[in-house]
Curated annotation (Swiss-Prot):
Family: Belongs to the selenoprotein P family.
GO biological process terms held by the UniProt record: brain development; locomotory behavior; post-embryonic development; regulation of growth; response to oxidative stress; response to selenium ion; selenium compound metabolic process; sexual reproduction
Any one GO molecular-function label of the UniProt entry: selenium binding
Principal localisation: secreted
Tissues of expression: Made in the liver and heart and secreted into the plasma. It is also found in the kidney.
Pfam name, any one: SelP_N
Protein name as it appears in the record: Selenoprotein P
Species the sequence originates in: Homo sapiens
Signal peptide bounds: 1-19
Glycosylation sites noted in the Swiss-Prot or TrEMBL record: 46, 83, 119, 128, 174, 338
A cellular-component GO term for this protein: extracellular exosome
Top-rank taxon: Eukaryota
Amino acid sequence: MWRSLGLALALCLLPSGGTESQDQSSLCKQPPAWSIRDQDPMLNSNGSVTVVALLQASUYLCILQASKLEDLRVKLKKEGYSNISYIVVNHQGISSRLKYTHLKNKVSEHIPVYQQEENQTDVWTLLNGSKDDFLIYDRCGRLVYHLGLPFSFLTFPYVEEAIKIAYCEKKCGNCSLTTLKDEDFCKRVSLATVDKTVETPSPHYHHEHHHNHGHQHLGSSELSENQQPGAPNAPTHPAPPGLHHHHKHKGQHRQGHPENRDMPASEDLQDLQKKLCRKRCINQLLCKLPTDSELAPRSUCCHCRHLIFEKTGSAITUQCKENLPSLCSUQGLRAEENITESCQURLPPAAUQISQQLIPTEASASURUKNQAKKUEUPSN
């Protein structure tokens, strides 16, 4: 709950939406008029909070984003955030147009996916957006947030929190299109938040101690040599001011984008990169061990002390900096997020050992971590 409050507070304090390509003058203003064929999606969504996702059908990560957007829609609806319009605009390129149907099939009929015409004015350009950007508008069509990578990853809570703020807070002033039903709902949400804040004791910030370990933050020199902050093939948007306030990170901004916009502090960026890499239970790992090794029946949850973040195209790779022990080398893959991680195998919890039923004589053993059931959790970094 405190994590959610921290995110909400950080987003409330934003003077900008979190993307270097966004001109601050566009905030709290309606976007340039755009249409696809004979449809005007923004006009059709007047009176509701509107979420515009710029996704590319030829991009594997964008396909995953579309699937997660559908999950987010269902989640928010169950929580009572029902007056939201979702719009996906596919890239204009030929490869994306050919895979339009694949992108459309990843969402329900409640999320329209628009395919741009080859010769029309590019909607992405009109909106000053890039691949995987999320633009969030209030009920009067005014831009509240423009989130870009890595903050637009739906594995992070930033897009969800930004939608909730646009839904219940008047970031751009009053809107005459807000219904009494929505106002009543937001009042209940506000009261519930206050009640939880009063009832919940002050948290002990164990994570601050956690960050003091030497392996938690990597210097900028440990990034891939091929990764240039602001390179066209691997854009990294700057951290919106205050977005990481609850982590108490401080640092000077560095310049790296051609437009000379502020880039995030090194610690903030590294922390985000670790969040991308660190997944408590990787779905399936194969631990290659000698048949006579005592470790053979014990492994498969993994831990790496020093992660190096790399982004190549649509792939996100997390690798161990140190050499892995000769008796235990693992390679895991999260297929649904295209994240590869090298790791060290660790002894999993007893419940996990029992459920794995591994055979000691096998040269290799595989296990599946039941993270959702909370029966098998991998050691965190």
